[in-house]
Structures are given as structure tokens and as C-alpha cells.
């Protein structure tokens, strides 16, 4: 609810394209979250996290806190940035998260919560 209210309150100055890229970046973030949650159930298969912030074997709780914080921070940073800087940031986040998701799927992780 908080995120929804914040988005509705703040993104009036965003272009239609920026809004679409913001949604796309969130889709990639949630897909990364989902595949990484799958990994937490499969450490016994040799999977390890490579994000140094999370450590090699984060708990599901730590992972959830990380991604919720990331999503909230992502909105506020996107809203703070203006014009072309906002667009470059959104393209970059979408590409980086998309690459992480592609890698996770490639190594056998699944999209599931």
C-alpha cells in the first residue's frame, strides 16, 4: 500500500516511457527476487549467491528484507533523478536485473516464491 501510494503521489512528472521502463525494471527486480528465493531452498545442490551484500547463503528473511528495501529505494531514486538521468538509470537497472534473471534461469533456478 505504501509503495502504491508513493507511486501515485510522485510520478506525475515522469514521461510515459519512464513509467513503462520503471514497471519493466520492477518486473526484472521481482523476477530476480523470485529466482533467488528458489536458490535459498536449494543450497544443498551447490547454489551460492554472488551478491556481496547478501553473502553466499542468505536466509529467506534477509533476502526478502533486501529486495523490499531495494524496491522502495529504487522508486525514490528513480523519482529523485530527472530527465535523461532517470532514463539512463532505468535502462541500466532493467538490463542488469534482466541479466541476473537470465543467468539464474540458465543455471536452473526457477521463478517461484
Residue ranges and their predicted role:
Residues 7-113:
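Hydrophobic alpha-helical membrane segments
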Amino acid at each position: 500500500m505504501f509503495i502504491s501510494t508513493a507511486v501515485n503521489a510522485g510520478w506525475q512528472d515522469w514521461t510515459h516511457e519512464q513509467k513503462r521502463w520503471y514497471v519493466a525494471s520492477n518486473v526484472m527486480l521481482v523476477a530476480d527476487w523470485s529466482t533467488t528465493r528458489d536458490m535459498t531452498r536449494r543450497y544443498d545442490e551447490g547454489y551460492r549467491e554472488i551478491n556481496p551484500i547478501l553473502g553466499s547463503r542468505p536466509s529467506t528473511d534477509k533476502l526478502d528484507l533486501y529486495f523490499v528495501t531495494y524496491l522502495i529505494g529504487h522508486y525514490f531514486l528513480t523519482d529523485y533523478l530527472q530527465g535523461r538521468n532517470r532514463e539512463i538509470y532505468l535502462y541500466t537497472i532493467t538490463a542488469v536485473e534482466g541479466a541476473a534473471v537470465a543467468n539464474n534461469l540458465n543455471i536452473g533456478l526457477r521463478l517461484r516464491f
